[in-house]
């Protein structure tokens, strides 16, 4: 019941993660009630997350590949065939993954490196997508992990790409090591690329914007604008962690806290109230009352005073405010359309 984890393995020329993280991953949770037969068939590898230095060096050359899983030669195996572009030539790789006593966990032996990889199907709905995690130990890199996203079709919903990014980050995989594959189309083994196109480069997850003002370019994660997720109902996700995160509440026009489980969920999920507000707040926030909140943090911020028609400084208590709260005078004026050249910061 771990066929998908297998595909994960064949593209693991570089499995990675921080050594100290991978060493503490003995209890990886596989897909609940995993059904092996439903994982069979064709999958497209659409994204990968890894901290392996080698992968980071070649990520611009990576492109979508396919993987076919089916019954193996024996009941103890799953057959795998992967097709991908490699160095301008369409390459096909076949192998077998060994089942274990845990449904959803597979082993794959790399004779070239004399190592055994462990692959786990951590989340799937079988007919649309699957997320696999692979662990490896090598004398060169030490213990490592790699996370991969597969789809039944060459394209997936943008929300799933965001969810994959969140899972990868929660596993300790750096933002610059999350790669969304370029789609060069399927290939026939032995075919050669006609002409590599510069624009067909791997899509990278983009770091959240750091600009204080709200007039900068929209935040983008992978291929989806983060602000497109602001109207989603927040999701704790299926995991059991208790991380305090912020979500945007369109009714109250405020960013509120919730407990995030640590995986999946959706894009309405922010590490800080500031990031949440600067991504999701609208100009309607300028008409809200100025709220200090019940907490006593005494943070100097800016808000728009509708009665005076200008931005003023106020003391924010640190909790239970609303969207009429800005981190510089310039940001307040940009949002609320106040003329002037003030540029004071808190």
From Swiss-Prot:
> Could you tell me one molecular function GO term of this UniProt entry?
serine-type endopeptidase inhibitor activity
| Record's keyword annotation contains Disulfide bond | yes
What residues does the record give for site: Inhibitory (P1) (trypsin)? 296-297
Tell me how the protein is altered or processed after translation.
The precursor is proteolytically processed into separately functioning proteins.
Q: Where is this site: Inhibitory (P1) (chymotrypsin, elastase)?
A: 240-241
List, alphabetically, the Pfam families matched.
Kunitz_BPTI, Lipocalin
Which cysteines are cross-linked by disulfides?
Answer: 90-187, 230-280, 239-263, 255-276, 286-336, 295-319, 311-332
Q: SUPFAM superfamilies in the record, alphabetically?
A: BPTI-like (SSF57362), Lipocalins (SSF50814)
InterPro entries associated with the record: A1-microglobln (IPR002968), AMBP (IPR029856), Calycin (IPR012674), Kunitz_BPTI (IPR002223), Kunitz_BPTI_sf (IPR036880), Lipocln_cytosolic_FA-bd_dom (IPR000566), Prtase_inh_Kunz-CS (IPR020901)
Task: Note the PROSITE patterns from the entry.
Answer: BPTI_KUNITZ_1, BPTI_KUNITZ_2
Question: Which sites does the entry annotate for glycosylation?
Answer: 114, 214, 249
What's the protein here called?
Protein AMBP
Q: Which organism is this entry from? A: Meriones unguiculatus (Mongolian jird)
What is the primary gene name for this protein? AMBP
């Amino acid at each position: 019941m771990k066929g998908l984890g297998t595909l994960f393995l064949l593209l693991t020329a570089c499995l990675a993660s921080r050594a100290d993280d991978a060493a503490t991953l003995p209890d990886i949770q596989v897909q609940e009630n995993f059904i092996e037969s439903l994982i069979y068939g064709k999958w497209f590898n659409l994204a990968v997350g890894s901290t392996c230095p080698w992968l980071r060096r070649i990520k611009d050359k990576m492109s979508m590949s396919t993987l076919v899983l089916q019954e193996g030669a024996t009941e103890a195996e799953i057959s795998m065939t992967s097709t991908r572009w490699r160095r301008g030539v369409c390459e096909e790789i076949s192998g077998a993954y060994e089942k274990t006593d845990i449904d959803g966990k597979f082993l794959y032996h790399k004779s070239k490196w004399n190592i055994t990889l462990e692959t786990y199907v951590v989340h799937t709905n079988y007919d649309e997508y699957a997320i696999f995690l692979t662990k490896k130990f090598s004398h060169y890199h030490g213990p490592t992990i790699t996370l991969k996203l597969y789809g039944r079709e060459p394209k997936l919903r943008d929300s799933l790409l965001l969810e994959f990014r969140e899972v990868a980050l929660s596993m300790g995989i750096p933002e610059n090591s999350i790669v969304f594959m370029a789609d060069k189309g399927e290939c026939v083994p032995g075919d050669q690329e006609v002409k590599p196109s510069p624009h067909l480069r791997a899509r990278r997850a983009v770091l959240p914007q750091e600009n204080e003002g709200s007039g900068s370019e929209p935040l983008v994660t992978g291929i989806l604008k983060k602000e497109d997720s602001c109207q989603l109902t927040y999701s704790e996700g299926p995991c059991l962690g208790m991380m305090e995160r912020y979500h945007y509440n369109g009714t109250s026009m405020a960013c509120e806290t919730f407990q995030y489980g640590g995986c999946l969920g959706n894009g309405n999920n922010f590490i800080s109230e500031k990031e949440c507000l600067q991504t999701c707040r609208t100009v309607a926030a300028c008409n809200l009352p100025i709220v200090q909140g019940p907490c006593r943090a005494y943070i100097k911020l800016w808000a728009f005073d509708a009665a005076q028609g200008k931005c003023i400084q106020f003391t924010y208590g640190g909790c239970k405010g609303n969207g009429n709260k800005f981190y510089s005078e310039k940001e307040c004026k940009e949002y609320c359309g106040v003329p002037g050249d003030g540029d004071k910061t808190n």
